[in-house]
């Protein structure tokens, strides 16, 4: 078949290939023949490199939540800030130290430029810390030297060495703190290799690495400029040319400008690196830092312990989304909502047969399925190992069916359902159509939706919609986030007032329900108005766990808070109805 592609009109004359900018020549490379057998040392830089790239940088509270998450997951080296750059970062580092929040086996890392007042301020922030890495950096690339610093190589070396000497000089400002050093030739990928090795080796002479006090040399792809194999070649070349190599921890810091940061990190690790810096789910400037979740779970899929706990990936994702105020993509490797979902009928059939084959083999060998080597088509990992269920994997409805239902609800009724609620409701529609057959119109879909999620108006139904019905509501004694809530609530045939407390209206409402023996836990919440007018009605959606059932509820009201209460009641009533009909928890609402 003839290739009919044609030249584009794009201005390719503006760009030069990487090999014409920086020479990386390693014909005797050895890394392609190597295999990864053990996890690298990890350093999470979410609190600095990730935080600086956020539209809304983390508050101290969100920073602490992120730090605690990283500690629980098992990260032992955590970059916590640039204390000389802002009072916020300085205060956060101090709070971690003064509140004894840093476990004995965790080392914090702080960033500084090579300036005297910044380095002194950095050491001031570390007073009282048991152990810390001082991360010194200055930019070394050809472009930065010419455009930003207007300096020759020696001028850049002088900056690095002056900074390194000041670091050693100011160690006395943090007595009792074990100080370790990291040096980064920033914009390393745009730096000539021989110059990168020279400036790193001169910095090493100042830092004086020993077996007990190794020095980290960090080689950042500050901007990803070439294919991952080129980065790996440069890492192997540097590993061969660094002095005191046995006392150097060679570290990688890939960015994702070309979309290949994970591959660059994995190949760079094969090429001789010992350590990798990155962020959870790849947050960071521009297209982000390398994704530590992808790197870690990739190791796990190969039977290599990542030495990091990813067993509750949804909690990790929700926490990161809260701290970063940015969503994790639905197809983000291992953590996205859709990564284990098959819409293709042939894929679903293969997955189903894979599960059946695993079960049959376990029975033949008289072992538990979890004791077998995982082997299911289209699923490179058991979703349960990341805390996921099989519910989304084995559902029968097609993508078009789900999309069509969601489109009609949005276009005809202005309801913009969250994706996971779309999936749940498409199962409800499928169950109805399987039982009754025939074409499903927009009006019929709306009727099914009302019957499942919304209380029918008294004029349209004589039947009780559910156990609970909301009356009036009021909040009082608001002190910061603390709320005391009073509601009028119908519980069966009884109408009474009830009071609850919590760190917000929904938490206070959960307190009221808990007092009635209903155990409710929130997973997800969203809301929107049904029109653009000032008096618009609001729709609220909640995903909750009600006494072991994970399901959605929907509430519609002129008041957004009341809409959220109604959504919770919707979910609770659905759970009660499912219990009464003995529907299994994972099929509640279907």
From Swiss-Prot:
The keyword Magnesium applies. It holds the Pfam family HMGL-like. The keyword Metal-binding applies. It is found in: Cytoplasm. Mg(2+) binds at residues 49, 253, 255, 289. Pathway: Amino-acid biosynthesis; L-leucine biosynthesis; L-leucine from 3-methyl-2-oxobutanoate: step 1/4. GO terms for biological process: L-leucine biosynthetic process. Its EC number is 2.3.3.13. Homodimer. NCBIfam families: leuA_yeast, PRK03739.1. This is 2-isopropylmalate synthase. It comes from Leifsonia xyli subsp. xyli (strain CTCB07). The lineage of its organism: Bacteria, Bacillati, Actinomycetota, Actinomycetes, Micrococcales. The gene is leuA.
